[in-house]
Structure formats: C-alpha cells, structure tokens
C-alpha cells in the first residue's frame, strides 16, 4: 500500500468519483515529493469481488417489499451513470430504469 486515506461515501456516484480523483492526485503528489515507503497488505484483509453483471442492478419485488428505504436509496445512487442503472421489471415485462434518486 503506497497511499491510503479514509473517505466518505456520501452523495451520488459522480460525487464519490470526484473525491476519488482528488485523493488520487493528492496521493500521487505525496509519492512524488517523498520517498516511497510501502506497507504490505495483509492477505486476510484483502477484499475481492467479481465484475458486476447487469442482472445485479435489478430491484426485485422482494426488495421493494422487505428492504428499508435507505437500502433502496443506496442501491439506486450507486448504480447511476456510468454504471448499468438500477431497474425494476413491471408485471407487463417493461423495464423501468432509475436514473437517479433523491431523499426529500
């Protein structure tokens, strides 16, 4: 690990990408200005995940009926562009895309 810093996941995906970009710049400048001293990551602490599939963006009837509002809010806001947007398949088979979400 060459640079690590905590950040908030508040806001929409574009806000989070903006913070990641700023942290990436900050980390790059820090590494260029100082000798690089890395810290070996513990394999047990590593997190692995597969590439997302479009089917993972579906909001099911079960989720709508059983999940709290903050779960649905977070799922939709994390699946805004450029990711495959959250969607719901209606009884008639039509797909309803969620392009964004706001809490009022």
What spans do the regions from the language model cover?
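Active-site-proximal loop/hinge segments within enzyme catalytic domains
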Residues: 1-104
């Amino acid at each position: 690990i060459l640079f690590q810093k905590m950040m908030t996941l508040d806001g929409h995906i574009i806000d989070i990408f903006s913070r990641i970009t700023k942290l990436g710049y900050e980390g790059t400048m820090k590494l260029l200005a100082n000798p690089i001293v890395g810290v070996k990551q513990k394999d047990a602490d590593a997190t692995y995940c597969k590439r997302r599939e479009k089917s993972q963006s579906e909001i099911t009837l079960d989720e709508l009926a059983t999940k709290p509002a903050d779960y649905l809010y977070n799922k939709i806001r994390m699946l805004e562009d450029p990711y495959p947007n959250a969607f719901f398949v209606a009884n008639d088979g039509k797909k309803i895309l969620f392009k964004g979400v706001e809490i009022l």
